[in-house]
Amino acid sequence: MIDPVLLREHPDVLRRSQEARGDSVQLVDEALQVDIERRAAITAFEELRAEQNAFGKRVAQAPKQEKKELVAQAQQLAGRVKEAQQVAAAAEARFESVLRKIGNPVVAGVPSGGEDDYAVLKEVGGIPAFGFEPRDHLALGELLGAIDMARGAKVSGARFSFLRGLGARLEIALMNLALDKALANGFVPLITPTLVKPEVMQGTGFLGEHSDEVYHLETDDLYLTGTSEVALAGYHADEILDVTEPLRYAGWSTCYRREAGSAGKDTRGIIRVHQFTKLEMFVYTLPEHAEAEHARLLAWQEEMMQALGLSYRVIDTAAGDLGSSAARKYDVEAWIPTQGRYRELTSTSNCGTFQARRLETRYRTESGKTAPVATLNGTLATTRWIVAILETHQREDGSVLVPETLRPYLGGLEILEPIGK
């Protein structure tokens, strides 16, 4: 949620941000008007309550013969106070409802526009060259006995798979490599809940216009998370933190996404699935340190890409493709040989105080007051990375060379061999 002070004092900042996102600029003006009405309602309530308190003292001190009439007046006044309180509460709810529709103000320099309007910041590693026709990750996975889409569909439906044998071992190895990288950089590991309450899902910004992407268990009123970011953001809800140094967490979880808007996209293999595993970095820090921490998260992601021998690029995501919570997001995309293009493997977002303000996660300032912390997140490994690893390191016979950094996590295995070879 945005800062009401920013709304009142710098509405043009929000107007420019909304315009860059392709969202309604009118929401800012609506919020300003509702804020005026809210403050007027609160003032009216507080004045009536002060009058009620003063009248109560008068009743207490009045002679006995006057009290009956004064008590009747006090009861009438109490009714007016209650009514004013209800009006103020309704105005507060309207204001919060409008505020929640306004996206996080984007950081200066974020490109305007939609999904295709990103800026390429760098490209690392050359395009892999093969002296043969490369196989895609599913063909390789089937040769290796590593990916079974048919039985995944039989058991659970489209966009589900079994990772078996070398596939299961490869994912576990990848996740453990990422976990060790996180530990080396001071992250505390957590295995997080994958079911969360509505207020936590709402607080992180995942129940807005894309709520149809989320699985909801209606009977229990719980949501399946598409990232451990949600649980990690809720971990310190309603708390006052010491963020003299950043609090860094690495959440390991199974993730679930409905992919409601992805009909016909990436229907082959495990690029876009309903269930996957992910190791997510999540940081609480001081707002003034958020941009520097964002750069660190990106650097750690790049270290992982380089450790796995993947060619990649980094893009600065355009404002209209950020989602409501992020003020800036970098995507790291790996080259997928059989598609002849880069595909997103990971992203990292600076959410500023947007999530913390909703979830009441605060720190104490030097003056002793409390203020919302900044939150950031970034993926360090996920199931989709297997796609790039298999395709990049494949050999003509269908075997796959294991990146050196993964070998200790696979018992020293250097080559993934096709079944029966």
From Swiss-Prot:
Localization of this protein: Cytoplasm
GO MF entries: ATP binding; serine-tRNA ligase activity
InterPro entries cross-referenced by the UniProt entry: aa-tRNA-synt_IIb, aa-tRNA-synth_II, aa-tRNA-synth_II/BPL/LPL, Ser-tRNA-ligase_type_1, Ser-tRNA-synth_1_N, SerRS_1_N_sf, SerRS_core, tRNA-bd_arm
Predominant localisation class: cytoplasm
Catalytic activity: tRNA(Ser) + L-serine + ATP = L-seryl-tRNA(Ser) + AMP + diphosphate + H(+); tRNA(Sec) + L-serine + ATP = L-seryl-tRNA(Sec) + AMP + diphosphate + H(+)
Top-level taxonomic group: Bacteria
EC category name: ligase
The keyword Phosphoprotein is assigned to this record: no
A Pfam short name: tRNA-synt_2b
EC number per UniProt: 6.1.1.11
The keyword Nucleotide-binding is assigned to this record: yes
Function recorded in the entry: Catalyzes the attachment of serine to tRNA(Ser). Is also able to aminoacylate tRNA(Sec) with serine, to form the misacylated tRNA L-seryl-tRNA(Sec), which will be further converted into selenocysteinyl-tRNA(Sec).
Record's comment describing the protein's domains: Consists of two distinct domains, a catalytic core and a N-terminal extension that is involved in tRNA binding.
Subunit structure and binding partners: Homodimer. The tRNA molecule binds across the dimer.
Protein name: Serine--tRNA ligase
Organism (species): Leifsonia xyli subsp. xyli (strain CTCB07)
Organismal lineage: Bacteria, Bacillati, Actinomycetota, Actinomycetes, Micrococcales
This protein's encoding gene: serS
